[in-house]
């Protein structure tokens, strides 16, 4: 895990606040990237220059029109009006240029073309979050390993994976030995356990499922991602089992057992979990995981997500998710800025899983993974998981992807 400290976001200042350990680590990373600068041409020819875009990089606290130069698969320069040539040029005038998006909750490895579809939408790193359990994990591992972009997967604690009748309604399916064996066999790809705890998935077994998940990962120093929302057990019982580095996805799920009470207060167990380093993730999804009134109340209470994710599936592209930029767009009319959104889709998720530790930034020397977005004004109907509609005045659209310094064609 990249960090055991949670990112705390101030709803007033709207800036990312990192703790001392993260600051020292970030400073060391900057020094490391600085050592690359001598390897790049200063005014000669680069491999690729993305010219004239509004470059937003929360890791650098950068928001301004810049030219972005790439050489040898890495960021070589970020400058105003760069006086240099390049083998290839992208005209990004009128567009937003950001680090490649990192989606930590997808089901991209359920389909062979899933990684490529994500990549064309600007997602240059993803986690497949529990599409399969130990019995059927080989296909997920193979698709994840073959992805062009950095990708990893979580094994579902239910050994048969996602089931219509509920992954762990039969508690014997939460097989500690089988999941641990899968993790140990595929340590290069499997980076944690997914535990779905909703009442239609685990029933009254939710506490025991989470306890077993921790039994699996704790000796391996790996995280658990919990799928919360409408659990049988109260969060006051479940959340004390969460350790630093674990992830709570579907944080905007409505009652029963939401993270916010009827009086608009975030539950104390939720606040305590964040303080000890648990990450809170959007996990948009298709069914039951996000409702506009809960989003509004939670954000008004000052409890902002650490990370955005889609819970992406091929089927979800025709429903409320569509793509990662669309999910981000839904939060613009809740008082979050474009910079707020980009931070939670780039630098913040880069801290959650070690595979992304050098991503989520456009610092010189970093891998040249870039998403180009277009922010279009207009009237857009955004749908939650309950078919409620909110009309927004702006939407982000994917307009280009660069992975390792190479252009990726749009799907």
Predicted segments — roles?
Residues 32, 38-49, 55-99:
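Histidine-rich, glycine-flanked metal-binding segment
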């Amino acid at each position: 895990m990249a960090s055991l400290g949670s990112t705390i976001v101030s709803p007033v200042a709207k800036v990312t606040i990192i703790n001392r350990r993260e600051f020292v680590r970030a400073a060391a990373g900057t020094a490391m990237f600085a050592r690359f600068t001598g390897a790049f041409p200063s005014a000669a020819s680069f491999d690729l220059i993305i010219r004239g875009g509004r470059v937003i990089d929360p890791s650098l606290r950068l928001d301004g029109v810049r030219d972005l130069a790439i050489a040898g698969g890495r960021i070589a320069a970020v400058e105003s009006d760069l006086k240099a040539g390049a083998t290839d040029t992208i005209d990004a005038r009128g567009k937003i240029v950001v680090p490649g998006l990192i989606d930590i909750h997808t089901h991209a490895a359920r389909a062979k073309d899933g990684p490529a579809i994500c990549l064309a939408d600007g997602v240059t790193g993803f986690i497949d979050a529990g599409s399969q359990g130990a019995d059927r994990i080989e296909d997920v591992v193979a698709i994840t390993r073959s992805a062009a972009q950095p990708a990893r997967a979580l094994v579902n604690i239910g050994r048969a994976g996602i089931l219509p009748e509920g992954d762990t309604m039969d508690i014997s399916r939460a097989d500690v030995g089988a999941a641990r064996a899968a993790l140990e066999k595929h340590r290069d790809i499997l980076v944690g356990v997914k535990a779905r705890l909703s009442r239609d998935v685990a029933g009254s077994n939710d506490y025991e499922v989470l306890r077993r998940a921790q039994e699996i990962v704790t000796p391996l120093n790996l995280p658990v991602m919990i799928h919360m929302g409408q659990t049988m057990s109260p969060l006051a019982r479940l959340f004390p089992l969460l350790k630093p580095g674990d992830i709570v996805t579907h944080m905007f799920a409505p009652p029963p057992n939401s993270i916010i009470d009827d009086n608009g207060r975030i539950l104390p167990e939720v606040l305590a979990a964040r303080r000890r380093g648990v990450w809170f993730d959007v996990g948009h999804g298709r069914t039951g995981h996000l409702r506009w009134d809960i989003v509004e109340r939670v954000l008004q209470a000052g409890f902002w997500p650490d990370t955005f994710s889609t819970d992406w599936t091929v089927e979800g592209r025709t429903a409320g998710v569509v793509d990662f930029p669309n999910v981000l767009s839904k939060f613009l009319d809740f008082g979050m800025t474009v910079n707020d959104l980009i931070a939670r889709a780039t630098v913040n998720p880069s801290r959650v899983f070690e595979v992304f530790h050098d991503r989520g930034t456009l610092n010189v020397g970093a891998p040249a993974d870039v998403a180009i977005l277009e922010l279009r004004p207009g009237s857009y109907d955004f749908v939650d998981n309950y078919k409620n509609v909110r009309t927004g005045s702006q939407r982000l659209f994917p307009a280009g992807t660069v992975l390792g310094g190479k252009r990726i064609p749009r799907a």
